[in-house]
Structures are given as C-alpha cells and as structure tokens.
C-alpha cells in the first residue's frame, strides 16, 4: 500500500515535471513558429495576407480640409498689417480608395513596382458645407509671379497683365476651385504657352503617384516594403547631401517585429522628402496592442536645434540665416512656386513665422502626425497625417498688388487631416488570425509551465512527507 502511494506520488511528480519541461520547450518553439508564419505572411507577393491588403487598402481613408479664410484682405494689401484668418471646416473627401496599378514583380532583385492612382470623392455628410462654399485666400498666381520671374522688366510686363485682369493680392474662390484647380484670369493673358490652371492640389484626380519600386521581402524580410526607387531614382534632386535620399517605406507598413527603440523612417511625396517617427506610447486599438509613433518637433527644427536638418535649409533670407524653424520650403519640388509645408497652425514653428498671422491656435493633440503600428507584423492599423500648405508672398516693387508690403509673409492657405483606422471586421480578423493566436499560445505555455511546476512541487512534498512518516 505504501509502495503504491509512493509510486503514485512519484508518477504525479514526473508528470508535473514533464508538463513544466514541455511548457518551457514550447516557449522558444512557439516563438519560432510565430516568427516563421509572420515572415511568410508579410511578404508582398500573391497569396499572402499582406499582399491582399497592400494592393487595395481595406481601411477607409478620409482627408479633411480646413481653409484659412482671410478677414482683412484690403488692410493687408494697403498697410502690410497682420493677416487675420478664420479657420473653416472640415470639408471631407474620401481618398486612397483605388487599388495599386501596374504591379510588377521582379524576382531578380526581390522587388515589386507599382503606381498609386489618385482620386478624391467629396463626402457631404462629413462636411460643414459644400464644394461651392467661397473663401478669401491669397491669390496664388499673383503671389508666385515675382518668385518665378525675378527680372524687373518681366515683372513690369506681368504687372500690366495683373492690372488688366483685375487681379489683386487676395481673391475669392470656391473650395472646389481652390483645391482642384481653376482658370486664372491673370495667367490667361500671358502671351506665351504656360499652364493657366491653378489649384493647391492641381492636378490630382486621374493622376498617379509613382512609379514606386519596393522590396517584397522575399529574400530579406527586414527590407519588406522599403522603397528602392521612386520614379526610377534613389534620390529626389531637391535637396543637398543625405536629405535628398529616399528612406524607409511609404508608412502603410514597416518590416515586422518593430521595437520601441526604433526610428521609423518613411517617404512622403506630399512633402517631397523622407521623414521619421519615434515611439511615444502603447495603445489598445480595438483589442489590438499597437505602438504609437509620432512625428517629433525635431523633424522640422532649424539646423541650430538639429544639425541633421542643415541640408533642408535652401535659402538664407526668409529663414533668417537658417534660424527659423517649423516650416519647409518645397519650392524646388513645385516648379519654383513659393510653397512651404508646416504642421497645422504652425505647430512647433518659430515665433517669427507665426507672428504676422492672427487667428492661429496650435494644439499638439489636434495637429500632430502619428502612426499606430502593430509591432509583430509591422502593419500601420491607424494613422493621422496632418500638414499645412502655405504660400510665401513678399514685397515686389514692380507689381502694384504687392508693392505696399513691408515684409514677407508665409501665408497659411489650408491644413489637412488624412486619417485611416482599421475597420471592425478587419480588426476582428486580425485578432483571430494574429494577436488571438499569439495570446492563446502564450496562455498555453504559461498554463503548462505553471501547472507542471505546481504538480511537481506538490507531489514531491507529499512523497517526502510519506517517506518521513513511514520511516518513523
């Protein structure tokens, strides 16, 4: 009887030890299985989970616009007063709803090339008004004229055309005209062939972005989705030195197994440069743990604050010898037009940039850019891209509409908020196929290890107690 009891206790202890060992072994084996599965499914080729969602995003993406309506146009034009603006919006469009086109795999270098069609559909139910709402804004053509044509004689000729067309420093335009284009009366009088259509995003609809060529991850998963070339080049030809390089992905996804310590680099054709985001916090998105990466203030800092930005300073006058910060001159990318990009309401911009403008209220939560990245797969499941489009206007002696200005202004035209969040159905699928399985595997590992250890310890204690009792 004593032997049977002792044998049973030893058997229980052995079973517990086996369970504990199996649970311990399952941890690295399970991690290897997860890693192998993830590496297979994030490759950008036909048949993988990543490829299906990469070709056409399953996320509804909206682009909201807020227009800066100028309240005192005559006062500014006559007296060079501060520009008073009133933000109006949002006006919402659905974008990025078209699938990638001309998708071509190249097995020689493990890349896939494509173009991304552009399109925008107005969403009245998500907007405060219609596309026909009017705004008083800077006259884009008049403001750009002295930048593109610096010769004083040519400016004199342009001045006569501006007067003849009854154009001035400011104009009234509908939302649709301002965003997507209108025939400019001044440019229509220019006696040689030029484009007479002007718009902040003209041309956009029925155009494509690319060609992009990205690594598909087939031979090296750590390079998946990273851009190899854009429009056939590895450099942009807009900036000096390393600032001109095309770095990272397009921000829709990143190589898997993202760490908090990483700097996520991505290229944005909207701002004509590569940029980066850093880890801020952990976020629970519809039951999925994600890492929130944010665009740091340092990305738009002056070279004095961040020496790495020295090659983004392209001129010395407006930038106060490269000491101003928070704005980026992308004129070279826009055919010489004086376009400046910033965060909305000049968030993180130097006082000399925002001082001439009244009515701005920068807010970190509303105006910053962030990416919510699922760290195991590297997929961006939620994002908010926020940026502001500004036009530089400065005094021009030969152009009467601008001759009364006493200083240059970087005038905010509009700011946009492009957002996308994984849908409920996609989130459930993601939980079931990825995070749910990983949690279940982790739970099984811990249960086996925990139960095994408890059984082993309990049975061994009982066995020792029995032996001690029998010995007496």
Swiss-Prot record:
Residues spanning the membrane: 8-29, 440-461
Cited InterPro entries: CD36/SCARB1/SNMP1 (IPR005428), CD36_fam (IPR002159)
One of the GO biological process terms: apoptotic cell clearance
Residues on Cytoplasmic side: 2-7, 462-472
Membrane topology, as annotated: Multi-pass membrane protein
Any Gene Ontology CC annotation: Golgi apparatus
Pfam families: CD36
Enzymatic reactions: butanoate(out) = butanoate(in); (9Z)-octadecenoate(out) = (9Z)-octadecenoate(in); (9Z,12Z)-octadecadienoate(out) = (9Z,12Z)-octadecadienoate(in); tetradecanoate(out) = tetradecanoate(in)
Subcellular location: Cell membrane; Membrane raft; Golgi apparatus; Apical cell membrane
Known tissue expression: Expressed at high levels in heart, intestine, spleen, adipose tissue, skeletal muscle and, at lower levels, in testes.
Domain of life, source organism: Eukaryota
Disulfide bonds: 243-311, 272-333, 313-322
Glycosylation site positions: 79, 102, 134, 205, 220, 235, 247, 321, 417
GO molecular function: amyloid-beta binding; cargo receptor activity; high-density lipoprotein particle binding; lipid binding; lipoprotein particle binding; lipoteichoic acid immune receptor activity; long-chain fatty acid transmembrane transporter activity; low-density lipoprotein particle binding
Region (Interaction with PTK2, PXN and LYN): 460-472
The UniProt record lists the keyword Ubl conjugation: yes
Lipid moiety-binding residues (S-palmitoyl cysteine): 3, 7, 464, 466
Post-translational modification: Palmitoylated by ZDHHC5. Palmitoylation is required for proper localization at the plasma membrane. Ubiquitinated at Lys-469 and Lys-472. Ubiquitination is induced by fatty acids such as oleic acid and leads to degradation by the proteasome. Ubiquitination and degradation are inhibited by insulin which blocks the effect of fatty acids.
Cross-link (Glycyl lysine isopeptide (Lys-Gly) (interchain with G-Cter in ubiquitin)): 469, 472
Extracellular side: 30-439
Annotated positions for site Critical for TLR4-TLR6 dimerization and signaling: 463
Family: Belongs to the CD36 family.
Subunit record text: Interacts with THBS1 and THBS2; the interactions mediate the THBS antiangiogenic activity. Upon interaction with a ligand, such as oxidized low-density lipoprotein (oxLDL) or amyloid-beta 42, rapidly forms a complex with TLR4 and TLR6; the complex is internalized and triggers an inflammatory signal. Through its C-terminus, interacts with PTK2, PXN and LYN, but not with SRC. LYN kinase activity is required for facilitating TLR4:TLR6 heterodimerization and signal initiation. Upon interaction with ligands such as diacylated lipopeptides, interacts with the TLR2:TLR6 heterodimer.
Protein name, entry field: Platelet glycoprotein 4
Organism of origin: Rattus norvegicus
